[in-house]
Curated annotation (Swiss-Prot):
Residues 603-618, 619-621 dip into the membrane without crossing it. The chain crosses the membrane at residues 553-573, 628-648, 824-844. The lineage of its organism: Eukaryota, Metazoa, Chordata, Craniata, Vertebrata. It comes from Homo sapiens (Human). GO terms for molecular function: AMPA glutamate receptor activity; amyloid-beta binding; glutamate-gated calcium ion channel activity; glutamate-gated receptor activity; ligand-gated monoatomic ion channel activity involved in regulation of presynaptic membrane potential; transmitter-gated monoatomic ion channel activity involved in regulation of postsynaptic membrane potential. It comes from the Eukaryota. This is Glutamate receptor 3. InterPro entries: ANF_lig-bd_rcpt (IPR001828), Glu/Gly-bd (IPR019594), Iono_Glu_rcpt_met (IPR001508), Ionotropic_Glu_rcpt (IPR015683), Iontro_rcpt_C (IPR001320), Peripla_BP_I (IPR028082). Changing residue 224 to K: Found in patients with familial episodic ataxia and impairment of speech development; uncertain significance. The gene is GRIA3. It catalyses: Ca(2+)(in) = Ca(2+)(out). Residues 1-28 form the signal peptide. The keyword Flavoprotein does not apply. Glycans are attached at residues 63, 266, 380, 415, 422. PANTHER family: IONOTROPIC GLUTAMATE RECEPTOR (PTHR18966). The postsynaptic actions of Glu are mediated by a variety of receptors that are named according to their selective agonists. This receptor binds AMPA (quisqualate) > glutamate > kainate.
Amino acid sequence: MARQKKMGQSVLRAVFFLVLGLLGHSHGGFPNTISIGGLFMRNTVQEHSAFRFAVQLYNTNQNTTEKPFHLNYHVDHLDSSNSFSVTNAFCSQFSRGVYAIFGFYDQMSMNTLTSFCGALHTSFVTPSFPTDADVQFVIQMRPALKGAILSLLGHYKWEKFVYLYDTERGFSILQAIMEAAVQNNWQVTARSVGNIKDVQEFRRIIEEMDRRQEKRYLIDCEVERINTILEQVVILGKHSRGYHYMLANLGFTDILLERVMHGGANITGFQIVNNENPMVQQFIQRWVRLDEREFPEAKNAPLKYTSALTHDAILVIAEAFRYLRRQRVDVSRRGSAGDCLANPAVPWSQGIDIERALKMVQVQGMTGNIQFDTYGRRTNYTIDVYEMKVSGSRKAGYWNEYERFVPFSDQQISNDSASSENRTIVVTTILESPYVMYKKNHEQLEGNERYEGYCVDLAYEIAKHVRIKYKLSIVGDGKYGARDPETKIWNGMVGELVYGRADIAVAPLTITLVREEVIDFSKPFMSLGISIMIKKPQKSKPGVFSFLDPLAYEIWMCIVFAYIGVSVVLFLVSRFSPYEWHLEDNNEEPRDPQSPPDPPNEFGIFNSLWFSLGAFMQQGCDISPRSLSGRIVGGVWWFFTLIIISSYTANLAAFLTVERMVSPIESAEDLAKQTEIAYGTLDSGSTKEFFRRSKIAVYEKMWSYMKSAEPSVFTKTTADGVARVRKSKGKFAFLLESTMNEYIEQRKPCDTMKVGGNLDSKGYGVATPKGSALRNAVNLAVLKLNEQGLLDKLKNKWWYDKGECGSGGGDSKDKTSALSLSNVAGVFYILVGGLGLAMMVALIEFCYKSRAESKRMKLTKNTQNFKPAPATNTQNYATYREGYNVYGTESVKI
């Protein structure tokens, strides 16, 4: 019974093959079923699904104009690391009598597969990386990227960059880049990353390149490896503005770019699949409806470009056999397919016809125009070039063999600008008086109405000119923006722009070189410089003799010597000039009848001193020079005193009515030379960066002190720095922008002041992300506001109109006020001293006179004992003359 059953099965099998053979040779020897092979490696699950689905689409959508043939497939999975597995898989396909093989290869399996194909004349259609080797029977579905990469390197003018390549695919491109580098004098650092298994090694490579100040990377790897590298880029914070990554891969939309996009780095890539192609859209519509149990990674995973190449490979195979069928080429296999390991190898006779037909195919697929050269390489194809911006990816142009790279016009940029009108722009800023402050009733308000200040008004005016909607966002860390020297990550408002969390920064943000490298600035809306803030010193009490301050000590000494000199000269010329002498009156009785009278002279030494003093005090006296020489002396002395007194009076008003404050510091040089007063800056900002980078000796000395000072002289916020100045009792100076310094001087308690000039010159600018479409519009708005004078009006409004220290009170070290007793106390002291001296001299004169009179009376009494007493009038006259001679008052006439 079993034998009969077995014989029945053998008969049925024989009948089946007989019918199949008759059907297979019904059209001039062309089979009705074309068997193709499939070789798939690991990580090609979706490609395997796309392969089977493409065959299914062809078999269910036949061209009715020709007698249809069906595609049949045989699939083997190979382990590329095992050469025996590769050989066994290929021989399995060859022994089945397949007409062509579709499959993948890598660097290890490529030589084995291409050798078998060449020896056995079996065509191998592959979407794997293209090779420059002139191999036969290999149809390369993937276009070469070498020309496109070189075109973009020239377009972006890269002269210094890093080339990270996969060992399996990068040698041909590496050779082309190195040849171009020699011709164009490029600096290229090439690193192979194909054999790296540890992700930490990627991180070490990126850190090493960053230490070399490398900002541009060309990454030539498969999608999975690119995703791994970009993940490390994000972790290290190297995806900020200023970095540019060119991804040498045809699946730009397959790469995970969401995290990198928000960092602000510029990313350029290539895309072979045009998602706007109706064929692509139709395929995807069917693709997403597939049962994922039958077609893994079809429904919930995006279509890879390698899957699209797989679909197109089936189109190419089908089109080639259509051509062979139309040409009535006999491609049928008769008998056994043979042994692939035979020595010598026995090639398939029809294999050359199939290879020729495959190379002659020209069809439109999901990857565009599909056409091959004589070596089976893609030709006459177009690759789209994409750029990743903060707002997303956009098509930047295209590349083909004839036109090379063709960038798109700025229409896309204008569209971005137009779209900004329809969305709310995020404006990052910082709480800093008077730029941005909370209103007193801010808790009852919402949105932008909660804030007030210079930058709030400026943002409103800019938005009005640019015609955008915006919302103010206070930066979370309260910092302006600096890059961490270790992690290289930007903080503050600059970080908000760099990492895509804000669109504009309207704040007192200084325009610096390091910031300009990662963000764009408008023209300055305010000019300023670094200045020194100290606590306002106590008003110096005027000295007792402050009335002497209008003239220097040297001038007073010269006046004293001039006074003495003029008096002596006047005395001498009066003695020498005969016109200063005159006879006594005839009515005057001579003192001694026996001696001739002496002609008197009014300008003795004491009278000369008295005359000079009276003229200097502008009071005059009873005597005046009579001679020409004496009058010349008096005239020049009067002229001298006129100028001196006028100058003194003019300065006296200012010195007595102005309270002066003595500042211990007047400049940065004063700070650098001393050690008693500490000084510092904001911990994160352009002021600190200025001192860190400065090459001026004074500033280098100051930076050396600041970075090593204990406790730290750096403050987290400006308010902390101001508070430290106020509490330090004059022992701390704060270095900050001059505009902020001037503003704080105008605020109560009015105890700070700006000293010295500005240390540098710079400006505040409105910042936008690198390459932002808003940059030009914002820049024009700032220029227009400046020309209209609105920027000056805003500064006056928030600095001086709302000042709390009086007009100019915080701006000047000198303050005019009413005179106090201390200002003129010295004058009263001199008055009291003069009165006291006069009383004392009078007392001395009285005592002296009394004593002299007593002696005279005794002498007279003794004389009377020897002589008769003289007449009374004669005695009185003699007494008077004696008294006169005692005092020597020659100017009195008797």
